[in-house]
Amino acid sequence: MNYTIEGAPMPVVICNLEGGETMLTEKGAMSWMSPNMKMETTTGGGIGKMFGRVFSGESMFINRYTAQGGTGLIAFASSFPGDIRAFEIAPGQEIVAQKSAFLASTAGVEMSVFFQKRISSGFFGGEGFIMQRLSGNGTVFLEFDGHIKEYELAPGQQIVVDTGYLAAMTAGCSIDIQTVPGVKNMLFGGEGIFNTVITGPGRVWLQSMPVAQLAGAISPFIPNKN
């Protein structure tokens, strides 16, 4: 499989497959394809994985698209203004991503639920509590919100993030929750009570326009139907 990622700020990834190659995707993610692409809807690994996907914010079912009788083409478009990034997954090169980041992948990539190891992260992490772990072998395409900034963290190096801005990280990074210091800062700072602290070693991808923050910003301007 080879691919190109085109367009901004609403990108699309166009995948060219050899005969017999398969792509996995969420329902409704396919944008266009050649007529020889065969679709099959599956639970993608049984009941346990099916409910695990639901718990991490994804659909119960996975669509498999296979090129039959020769080369095929299939495209997957982003659902929100932002960026599509390709990641090569292999043993020891796992990626942990925000909920609903998964767009498509080759057949060898596996998706599971990633829970924070620290109890405090679970209770107070908000959007960061449940994330997706991408493992196995292959290429995965993730969609992020807004502009993406990447950081390489050395062992023990930290970055403090408003939780919704964490798009993805390599599995070697760890997460904890930090309370905003000072009661006045908590009550009047407008930044919430908790921040996410990411500790290296590893790479971190941060997004500039989380959907939840955008929705909150525009909601006062949406007319009330009542």
Protein language model features and the residues they cover:
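Composition-driven recognition of glycine/serine/threonine/acidic- and proline-rich low-complexity segments
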Residues: 1-226
